[in-house]
């Protein structure tokens, strides 16, 4: 069992039951999945960009991402339907908890001028989104071997009904909120 998974069962669940007064353990919000998404608009001109991004995401997530394709053509962006324009990977279970552990304890402290993550990036239904400006904050990425700095979006999906519940859940996982 992953370290954060054990931590969730032993510390987070009892803490949230006490805070929100849940009657059942199954009511306690939990993280269902973490989605990592890289939008690659520059892939239209250079096909190697997709390969490099897929390689980076594979190292970060520990599993192979799926290449996302354009759903419809947009002439203004010179995109045709079916063009590869991004890569995404969905983590669940053990891999999800291990990624969360690495993200909170190793990657976030490596961000330059880091003052904490925004406490306002919830969507109203208990899900949290965070944007990372450069992939080199992850220790798996070798700075000398990357071709370009790329950002990615990390979407954390929870079973929480409200943003307050989701924020309490993530805060109990030692998420460094600034507000």
Swiss-Prot record:
Keyword terms, alphabetized: Ribonucleoprotein, Ribosomal protein, RNA-binding, rRNA-binding, tRNA-binding
Keyword presence, RNA-binding: yes
Listed GO CC annotations: ribonucleoprotein complex; ribosome
One of the protein's GO biological processes: translation
Keyword Translocase: no
Family per similarity comment: Belongs to the universal ribosomal protein uL5 family.
The protein's name: Large ribosomal subunit protein uL5
């Amino acid at each position: 069992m992953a370290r954060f998974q054990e931590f969730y069962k032993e510390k987070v669940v009892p803490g949230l039951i006490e805070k929100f007064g849940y009657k059942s353990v199954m009511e306690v919000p939990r993280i269902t999945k973490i989605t990592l998404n890289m939008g690659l608009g520059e892939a239209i001109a250079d096909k190697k960009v997709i390969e490099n991004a897929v390689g980076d995401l594979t190292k970060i997530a520990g599993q192979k991402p799926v290449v996302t394709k354009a759903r419809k053509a947009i002439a203004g962006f010179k995109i045709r339907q079916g063009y590869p324009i991004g890569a995404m990977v969905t983590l669940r279970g053990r891999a999800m908890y291990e990624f969360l552990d690495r993200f909170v304890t190793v990657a976030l402290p490596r961000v330059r001028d880091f003052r904490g993550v925004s406490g306002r990036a919830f969507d109203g239904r208990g899900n949290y989104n965070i944007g990372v400006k450069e992939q080199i904050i992850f220790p798996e990425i070798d700075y000398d071997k990357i071709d370009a700095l790329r950002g990615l979006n990390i979407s954390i999906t929870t079973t929480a009904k409200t943003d307050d519940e989701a924020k309490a859940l993530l805060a109990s996982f030692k998420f460094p909120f600034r507000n």
